[in-house]
């Protein structure tokens, strides 16, 4: 398995299995099959509505948690400091994990500044191992980094 090292030193598998548009009734089986053939990076999102099924697969797969890399994304309806923080804690429960390896802000709309502050706080608490963004243009990324 090849890895990329993120800016904070966390190693992320280069190849991941994404669950976008996988039906709830198929998701758990698909994730279990992906893990069985060697995938260790599973990518989901709040807006995919299948975090719970991913969590079921994680808990049943028999692979130690530290060998898996789980990514999820906060949806814009959950932006703002309080809503983002609560949504991430809810995602952790659905995923049945004590921490999430990578949490991304899914889109550059609404109060992503507040959401980013929540991610930073949860990162500091060890509930998130890495923070990132998805679908952000360079100028929006520069705004957050400032």
Segments the model singles out, each with a brief description of its role:
Residues 11-14, 24, 36, 60, ...:
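Context-gated lysine
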Residues 79-146:
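Glycine/proline-rich, positively charged
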Residues 1, 26, 49-50, 62-63, ...:
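Generic structural signal for short, solvent-exposed loop/turn connectors between secondary structure elements
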Residues 32, 52-56, 72, 86-89, ...:
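N-terminal, well-ordered alpha-helical segments
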Residues 12-16, 40-41, 67-73, 99-104, ...:
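Structural preference for beta-strand elements that scaffold enzyme active sites
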């Amino acid at each position: 398995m090849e890895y990329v090292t993120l800016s904070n030193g966390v190693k992320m598998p280069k190849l991941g299995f994404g669950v976008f548009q996988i039906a709830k009734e198929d998701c758990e089986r698909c994730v279990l099959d992906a893990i069985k053939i060697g995938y260790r990076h599973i990518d989901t999102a709040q807006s995919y509505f299948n975090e719970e099924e991913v969590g079921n697969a994680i808990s049943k797969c028999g692979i130690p948690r530290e060998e898996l890399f789980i990514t999820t994304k906060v949806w814009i309806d959950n932006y703002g400091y309080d809503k983002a923080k609560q949504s991430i804690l809810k995602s952790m429960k659905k995923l049945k994990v004590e921490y999430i390896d990578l949490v991304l802000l899914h889109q550059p709309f609404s109060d992503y500044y507040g959401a980013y502050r929540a991610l930073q706080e949860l990162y500091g608490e060890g509930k998130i191992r890495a923070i990132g963004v998805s679908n952000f243009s360079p100028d929006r990324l520069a705004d957050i980094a400032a």
